[in-house]
Structures are given as structure tokens and as C-alpha cells.
Regions:
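Residues forming the flavin
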Residues: 1-382
Length: 382
């Protein structure tokens, strides 16, 4: 991403959305709406002073609402461009004109409340839709106690808890009392392979990311007792099954074939009850329950499909054919990554490479007609 941001032949439009797409392959015209950042990205040094002085707290969406940020902020350290922006929905200056602390304290004079939305018209040859995936609806999570019990968390929230740059600086603790964990349960296939929520497909990534998160947790605390409740183990990918077996042996992860119907709270702990393959009823208490969320279609998939003139399948992902999995239903429009269907990062990167080759073939006649070459002054050898 950093390399792409530095390339003179790649233009990154942030805070932007596609509004229209007209024309034919090789000669598309895209109408783009770009929202203002209210901070000049050329002047901003990302020092963080504006965030420090801003009196308006907001939930940090990047940290899965587990920490607090401010109206002027940067989503994460490696964000492109490496500059802050102001959330217009919560900024006191934009909504009520009652505050100007960020502008008064910015030594780079980067705050610019005069910025307005822009309408852009772009001449393009091909379109690649890489919208990513959407989140499972919260109503699916609620039957497991999510939202009622603080120690029932999603896999994304647990990922941030294990991260050194996360809200707890990598210390895995109970959210209810901030005490260290002793027992963790992972529940698989939450929002996947479940016709009651309309998602009958396997999300393909949940088994392996649960194994990874459990392994990371054991590296943080070797005394943790971790149980993973699977309906079926589907570690899809080259060498993934062997990697799963190594993790189970190395860290002593317990793999239990059962589908948990609900989560109860007993004396401050979380109670799980299940039936084994042999009909035996079991129950156990845990300090934290992690819900391994499946991958949903992007929430704006329908709107983008109407604008781009493409079709979606009955699950809301981009409709493609078996023999052309990277080609959408409109000529010149391609798809890559989880918008085509649930998949992991390596497969998404592979698809992106394939799409780049197909787009390059489509535009072969005009190749290198708009490229820019960086020139450097000659070295002074005297």
C-alpha cells in the first residue's frame, strides 16, 4: 500500500465513491464523488496534536469500538495518505461552529474547514471491483449473548485485543473486569453454513484464522486453556491442514466437534452446553467466548452493482461464471477478492494478479501512453 501511494502512476482517491459508470470497455467515463478531509494532506505532518486537543470523543472503529478516538484522527499508522482527517458527523466546528481548537493548535496550519465535496469525471479503460467483504448482521450474534455479555466478543475484536497496537496493547484480558483470561472458547461457523440467516455457504477463512488467533493467544499466555468448537474443520488451502495439526499439537488446543446453540452466564463466567457425537451432554465454563464471524457480501454491493451495471448472485456477491471467475456480467468490468465470494488474502492477491493481466490485455493498444517516469538530477561527480 505504501509503495502504491508513492507511485507516480497510481492515483488514490480517499473518501470517494462511484456514482456513475458510462461507456464501453476501453472508453469508460466514471463519475466520482469525493468528500472533503478538512485537513490538507500536503501540509499535515501526522503529529497528532489536533487529536490531542480535540474535546469530541468518538468510538474507534478500527479498534472495533474497544477504544476512543477523536473527530480529527488517522485510522491506523500505515494509512494512505499518511495524514489525518476530520469526521464531519461528529466535529463540533462543522456541526455547531462552537470549537476551533484543532485549527488553533495545528503548527502546520493544515486544518481547512473551507474544503467542499468534489465531483470528478475520470476517463478509464477498465474497472476492477474489489469491495472486500461485509460483516455478519448483529442479530445473528445476539443469540450467542453478544451485546449482553461483555466477554462474548467477535473474532475481529479478539484480533485487536491480541495486537500490540490494539486497545489493550496486546494484553488479552476479560473486557468485563480487565482480569487475565484462563479459558477461552472459539465458536465456529457463526453466520456461515446457516440457512436461518440466509448464508448457506462456507466462508472458507474462519477455521484458519481461529487457529491463528488461538495460537497467538497461547504465545501470549502458555497457561491458557483454549477450546475450539467446530461443526466441521475446513482448513482450505495448500498446507493449511498440516499447519492446523501442528498448532493443535504445539499449543494443546482442544478441538471439539459440536455446534453451540447459545451462551449463558453463570456466576460471572460464560456457560456452554453441547452434545457429543455419541449423545453425551457436556457443559463447561469459560472466561471469554470468541465468535468466529463468517464473511458476508459488502453492505453497499447492491448500490455498486446498479451503478456498474453488473449482476449479483443470490448471496449478494458479484455474479461470475465457473470458467471466468474474474469477469463480471458487464464487459470491461472485473472482480477480485472477497466481493467475488469468500476467500483469504493469498487467493485474493492471486485473483488481483489475474485481473491486472486481463485489464492489461484489454488496454494493450494504449499501454504506456499515460505513464509518468520519475526523473532525477544528474549526480554531481566533481
Amino acid at each position: 500500500l505504501v509503495e502504491a501511494g508513492r507511485s507516480p502512476n497510481i492515483e488514490i482517491l480517499t473518501n470517494a465513491r462511484l456514482e456513475t459508470l458510462e461507456g464501453e470497455p476501453g472508453q469508460f467515463t466514471a463519475g466520482v464523488h469525493q468528500e472533503p478531509r478538512f485537513i490538507d494532506e500536503d501540509k499535515c505532518t501526522a503529529c497528532g496534536t489536533c487529536t490531542m486537543y480535540c474535546p469530541r470523543p468518538i468510538v474507534d472503529l478500527y479498534n472495533e469500538r474497544l477504544s476512543i478516538s477523536r473527530a480529527p484522527h488517522i485510522d491506523y499508522v500505515q494509512a494512505i495518505p499518511s495524514s489525518y482527517y476530520i469526521d464531519p458527523k461528529v466535529c463540533l466546528r462543522i456541526n455547531y461552529e462552537t470549537c476551533n481548537l484543532c485549527a488553533q493548535t495545528c503548527t502546520a496550519q493544515a486544518i481547512d474547514f473551507s474544503q467542499k465535496p468534489r465531483k470528478l469525471s475520470l476517463d478509464i479503460g477498465a474497472v476492477v471491483l474489489a469491495l472486500g467483504f461485509g460483516r455478519i448482521d448483529q442479530s445473528v450474534l445476539e443469540k450467542y449473548g453478544y451485546g449482553r455479555f461483555l466477554d462474548v466478543v467477535t473474532s475481529m475484536e479478539f484480533e485487536r485485543l491480541t495486537c500490540a497496537s490494539g486497545p489493550t496493547e496486546g494484553h488479552i484480558v476479560r473486557l468485563s473486569d480487565k482480569k487475565p483470561l484462563k479459558k477461552i472458547a472459539f465458536l465456529q461457523c457463526v453466520g456461515s453454513r446457516d440457512e436461518t440467516c440466509g448464508n448457506g455457504y462456507c466462508s472458507t477463512v474462519c477455521c484458519m484464522y481461529a487457529i491463528k488467533e488461538a495460537s497467538v493467544a497461547k504465545e501470549h499466555n502458555a497457561d491458557l486453556d483454549i477450546a475450539l468448537f467446530f461443526m466441521d474443520v475446513r482448513s482450505q488451502g495448500k498446507g493449511f491442514d498440516a499447519a492446523r495439526e501442528r498448532a493443535e499439537d504445539k499449543y494443546g488446543l482442544r478441538v471439539i466437534r459440536a455446534r453451540i446453540p447459545r451462551v449463558d452466564q453463570v456466576d460471572g463466567q460464560l456457560a456452554l452446553t453441547w452434545t457429543t457425537d455419541y449423545g453425551k451432554s457436556c457443559s463447561e465454563l469459560f472466561d471469554m467466548v470468541v465468535l468466529s464471524e463468517g464473511l458476508n457480501a459488502p453492505k453497499d454491493a447492491k448500490a455498486i452493482a446498479e451503478i456498474a451495471g453488473i449482476e449479483l448472485n443470490h448471496y449478494g456477491f458479484c455474479k461470475t461464471s465457473v470458467d471466468s471467475p474474474l469477469v463480471a456480467s458487464r464487459d470491461g468490468v472485473y472482480v477480485a477478492g472477497a466481493f467475488q465470494g469468500p476467500k483469504d488474502i493469498p487467493e485474493s492477491v492471486t485473483q488481483a494478479s489475474g485481473v491486472a493481466a486481463m485489464a492489461s490485455e484489454l488496454l494493450s493498444e494504449v499501454r504506456n501512453t499515460r505513464t509518468v517516469t520519475i526523473s532525477y538530477p544528474e549526480e554531481d561527480k566533481t
